[in-house]
Amino acid sequence: MLFRNETNLSSNDYIRFGGIKLDFSLCKRIIENISHVIVGKNQSIELLLVALLADGHVLIEDLPGLGKTLLAKSLARSIGGSFRRVQFTPDLLPADITGFNVYNQQTGQFAFQLGPVMTNILLADEINRTIPRTQSSLLESMEERQVTVDGKTYPLPHPFFVMATQNPIELEGTFPLPEAQLDRFLLKIRLGYPEKEEEIAILERFREKDPLIELEAAASPEQVAELQHTRKGIHISHIVQEYITNIVRATRENTSLRLGASPRGSLGLMRAGQALAALREREYVLPDDIKSLVIPVLAHRLILKEEERLRGTSPEHFLEEIINQIPVPAPTG
């Protein structure tokens, strides 16, 4: 599983006994359920659950055919939630996502036609294939959990979780996501090609039947919503908060970066750390939780200076330098 390299800290330094009751077995069941379909992507599955528990959204950047849609469908089935997929194309309109009013000639009134955004799990497939105006139509729903059509506001189901996929920017015909929208995603992950043994296992698993068809729910949307609420009670000490702040501020002070992480990045690290602690069956966040999440939470929020981009340097490179330079807090007492 992901993030097992933890500092041996005393629980007295980080734990707060507040009567928190998390059904940790439920988190494990969801992960195991998804693993019945998805082969060899335990790290990606855990990050997906981190984002879900943190009430965030995920951006997946990878090539076609690596299982992004299958992963989204497996998550939706595992939590017993609804699932919709939107294929983003250059001619896609905002109303194709949010919904629109339709005039009913019999009643003489307008009726709201629900858009695909009215779901628990929304797969925004190849989001960088469409124009910025349509991309931005997701902003309100991702941040506010609601859509506004013709001046009327409609709340979205809870939980509401966006999994957006995008092709690597070097591919032709892409519209890079603006910084404001990138910042709305809690995590960015890559699935990557499977190992040889994993690919053989995929062939064997799908040889006679599709395991997704037989996948049963391991939880309900109501249970997931309760976990999201309870996650907020996971204790994060002042020491860990200061560690988060030091990392984020270092991105702003790095002279090779045109844009560092915003306070939303700090909040994202905190919430992701709480969610990871819950998955690890703890009521408190360790500094190593944060250290393990720095790259997936912050890398997509950083903008390189042009000269660094031309050199082929990645945001991940600078984050690794920052992680190595800033000491991990030691337990006190």
Residue ranges and their predicted role:
Residues 174-229:
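Conserved AAA+ ATPase core "coupling" helix
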Residues 111-120, 149-166, 177-186, 264:
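AAA+/SF3 P-loop NTPase mechanochemical coupling elements
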